[in-house]
Amino acid sequence: MPAAALLDDFLAFTLAGEAPAERDGACAGGAVRWQWLGDGLLAFEPAAADAAARASVLVSAGVHGDETAPIELLSMLVRDFAAGALPLACRLLVVLGNVPAMRAGERYLDDDLNRLFSGRHAQVPASREAPRAAQLEAAASAFFAAAPAGSARWHIDMHTAIRASVFEQFALLPHTGTPPTRAMVEWLGDARIAAVLLHTAKGNTYSHFTAEHCGALACTLELGKVRPFGQNDLTRFAPADRAVRKLVSGERAEGGATLPRVFTVIDQITKQSDALELFVAADVANFTAFARGTVLAQDGDYRYTVKHDEERIVFPNPTVKPGLRAGLLVVDTTRDTLAALV
């Protein structure tokens, strides 16, 4: 298939499952060099020689194959700067994550790809997601290893959520052992992200991997509800899309944007067995608040009771496999977190 088809509609090209006739070339009137690195993997770099100051940005979508809106936005981003309609001012790696699941219209085929990073894929060698997790780790590692010394490194991993949320668009920041950076929190404010969830333990997500192993400023964005391809109202994603476009084109974020509220994980509900009961409505929204003393879950001898004056539940899901997280509990830490930004 001609390379023009790859750049004009990266999504359709990837879903078709073909390789381009050329694996690299130039676009945007010769201003940008591109390289196809494999299914759903495209690298770009400005042809100009000012590499020393150039940021390295990884933008990913489709780590869950049914989260279509960010995939569509990412394909349009590629189209626009390949055509010269949007300048490219950074090294850029564009990733469509779980391509077989995208083709099937499923979240995943065997295992949640976003739980298989930082080497966890080695524990499930029979999983159809395991080789892809290893491939995405290798691609990110090689991309950031080639970054100019001292230059900025970013990873924006875009998702949509299965359920509604008190805050329709929110972000998750991986645990790094240090406070969040002002650059990331201000970028999230510019993207009109209403809330940020801070993890307090290492995880196996894509953004955890790039933060810990590649030194990237990394976040997972939850940008709304899961819908089939072609059924998304992309205007609802416009602020986040604009912020990503500013990041890759080198445009400064607007000053004075409202910073998001910040919530910190204080516990999780882990599914011990198939007897787990969650005492919340099946359609409870992410960030729904519960008062001290409320019993939220029971699983055999295990019981989770709210310990703070107010805790909010995020990602409740009793259908996960035993041993996996069935819900996160968070508390509001906005004041202390914003005061400690670095």
Swiss-Prot record:
What role does it play?
A: Transforms N(2)-succinylglutamate into succinate and glutamate.
Q: Which UniProt keywords apply?
A: Arginine metabolism, Hydrolase, Metal-binding, Zinc
Cited Gene3D superfamilies: Zn peptidases
Give the residues the record marks as binding Zn(2+): H64, E67, H159
List the InterPro entries: AspA/AstE_fam (IPR050178), AstE_AspA_cat (IPR055438), Aste_AspA_hybrid_dom (IPR007036), SuccinylGlu_desuccinylase (IPR016681)
Q: Which organism is it from?
A: Burkholderia orbicola (strain MC0-3)
The entry's active site is: E222
Q: What is its EC number?
A: 3.5.1.96
Q: Matching SUPFAM superfamilies, A to Z?
A: Zn-dependent exopeptidases
User: Cofactor(s) for this protein?
Assistant: Zn(2+)
User: What Gene Ontology terms describe what this protein does at the molecular function level?
Assistant: hydrolase activity, acting on ester bonds; succinylglutamate desuccinylase activity; zinc ion binding
Query: What is the protein's name according to its record?
Result: Succinylglutamate desuccinylase
Q: How is the cofactor bound?
A: Binds 1 zinc ion per subunit.
Q: Upper taxonomic classification of the species? A: Bacteria, Pseudomonadati, Pseudomonadota, Betaproteobacteria, Burkholderiales
Catalyses which reaction(s): N-succinyl-L-glutamate + H2O = L-glutamate + succinate
Single Gene Ontology BP annotation: arginine catabolic process to succinate
Q: In which pathway does it act?
A: Amino-acid degradation; L-arginine degradation via AST pathway; L-glutamate and succinate from L-arginine: step 5/5
Q: Which family does it belong to?
A: Belongs to the AspA/AstE family. Succinylglutamate desuccinylase subfamily.
